[in-house]
A protein has these predicted regions:
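Zn2+-dependent cytidine deaminase-like catalytic core
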Residues: 42-143, 227, 234, 274-276
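Short, flexible helix/strand-to-coil boundary loops that buttress conserved ligand/catalytic motifs
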Residues: 113, 148, 178
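N-terminal glycine-rich anion-binding loops that anchor highly charged ligand groups
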Residues: 32-46
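Enzymes that bind and transform nitrogen-containing heteroaromatic metabolites
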Residues: 2-36, 70-75, 93, 160-316
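Short capping loops/turns at secondary-structure boundaries
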Residues: 117, 121, 137-140, 155-159, ...
Length: 316
């Protein structure tokens, strides 16, 4: 039997274990793309008997990690499995998790988010139900969607999740005297490199590339370098993806077809304005320095005409 949401009686218990799932899942940030981040907790009575999370793309999913690393496998029968995404029921790089859950006679599955991927999308629930496993859905649903916002945007909107990022002075200038200049404190440069490891790709326009010849690597933080993209006609080095000058919508469609789930845009004013005016972005990350320049290249200034409820904006 499938229940649409958790009952009020068990809500606090379900939320406690689901929050643990989300915490475990978050360890996969930047490592599992383009897969979603998933964590799993298995409970027998009031005791956690196993945990796991999806650690790297191509490796075992969270449910399989938890089940196969359970120190007392005989206790899995009749247990409750918490997972923040609908278990898969198809063969991909790894076997289906739903089959393993059925095989180990787990009694109940509690889920945070449905999986919109057409290869799953309810089929995991069906497999569990047909085996007589009770399924409870939508526990901490909004928190789960936020954690996997890249995945859900990619699946539902068929484009990468887009983050616009720039640095500006205290009075809103990107560069004094229109010249490249490092505005913020050194530790924020490290933060910028950390952010790069979390996204699949990074993009600049041809103007920024010609002026700055940026490396766009994550050399100050441990993790994978993003795919480096330049938009426009330049002589880009090997290892970069060069895309022709085209609309933002067409650019994002091209990246979607290349299975690029998320994108951070670190271009200059022109390319940032193009994304802002298109409305095809999800976050704005602004690193604000302490200095006042009084003149120079003004930073973008999204207004109420370009902001919609799905955009998230914050300052660091």
């Amino acid at each position: 039997m499938m229940t649409p949401s958790a009952s009020h009686t068990n809500l606090s218990t379900h939320e406690r274990y689901m929050r643990r799932c989300l915490h475990l899942a978050s360890h996969g940030l930047g490592r599992v793309k383009p897969n979603p981040m998933v964590g799993c907790v298995i409970v027998q009575g009031e005791e956690v008997i196993a945990e796991g999370y999806h650690q790297c793309h191509g490796q075992w999913h969270a449910e399989r990690n938890a089940i196969l690393h359970c120190p007392c496998p005989e206790r899995l029968e009749g247990s409750t499995l918490y997972v923040n995404l609908e278990p898969c029921s198809h063969h991909g790089l790894t076997p289906p998790c739903a089959d393993l859950i059925v095989e180990r006679r787990i009694g109940r599955v509690v889920v945070c988010n449905d999986d919109p991927n057409p290869r799953v999308n309810g089929l995991g629930y069906r497999r569990l139900e047909e085996a007589g496993i009770e399924v409870t859905r939508h526990v901490l649903e909004e928190e789960g969607r936020w954690l996997n916002r890249r995945f859900f945007t990619f699946q539902e909107q068929q484009r990468p999740y887009v983050i616009l990022k720039w640095a500006e002075s205290a009075d809103g200038y990107m560069a004094p005297n229109y010249q490249p200049y490092w505005i913020t404190r050194p530790y924020l440069k490290m933060l910028s490199h950390k952010w790069r490891t979390e996204e699949a790709a990074i993009l600049v326009g041809a103007g920024t590339y010609r002026a700055d010849h940026p490396q766009l690597t994550a050399r100050l933080w441990k993790g994978q370098n993003p795919l480096r993209i330049v938009l426009g006609e330049v002589d880009a080095p090997e290892g970069w993806l060069q895309l022709p000058h085209q609309s933002i919508a067409d650019t994002l469609h091209t990246l979607y077809e290349r299975n690029i789930q998320s994108l951070i845009v670190e271009g200059g004013r022109k390319i940032l304005d193009a994304f802002i005016h298109s409305g095809l972005y999800d976050e704005v990350r602004i690193l604000r320095g302490d200095a006042h320049y009084g003149a120079g290249l003004k930073a973008p200034h999204p207004d109420s005409l370009t902001i919609n409820p799905s955009n998230i904006h914050y300052y660091v």
